[in-house]
Amino acid sequence: MNTPFYVFMKLLPKCAVSRAFGFLTRLKLPVLSTVAKNWFASYYKLDMQEAEFPLEHYKNISELFIRHLKEGARPIANSEVVSPVDGVLSQSGPVENMIQAKGKTYTLASLLRDEKLAEQFAHGSFATIYLAPFNYHRIHSPVKGKVIGASYCPGTLWPVNKGSVERIEGLFCINE
C-alpha cells in the first residue's frame, strides 16, 4: 500500500487542493477562461455538437463541465436497465458482495454510513459507474420517482481513478 503514489496522495492536502481547483474552474476571466475551455474541450475530445450551447457560451470550465445537452442527445433506450449517466460500468452485482476492484470489497452499511438505511436495501443490487473528466456530468433518473431524502457523507477527497480504486482500501466508503 505504501507506493510512492499512495504516500504522495496521503500527504497531499486534498481538501485544500480540491477547493483551489474548484475556485480556479469557476473564475470568469475571459482570456484565461477561453484558453482553459479550449484546452479542456480539445484534450478530452468533448463532443460539443451534443451540447445545448457552443463552447464560447460557457464562462468557465465549471460551466462547461456541467453543461446541458441538446434535447434528444440522449434518447432513452427501450431496455430493462438504463444508465443514469455517461460513464463506464466498472462493477455491479448484489449489495451483499459489493466489489471496489481487484477483490477489494466493502459493505453497503460502510458506504452509506448507516446500518438501518442499509437494511432497507438488503438483497438489492449495485452498480458502480465511473465518470471520466470528458463524460457528461449530469445525472438523470433512469426510473420515474420522487426524491424523498438525501444525505451528505463527509470524508476525504481521494481521486477515484483506476489507480486509486485499485490501491486505496475502502475508497468509496472514506471519500466524500
Where are the language model's segments positioned?
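Non-catalytic terminal segments and appended small domains
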Residues: 1-176
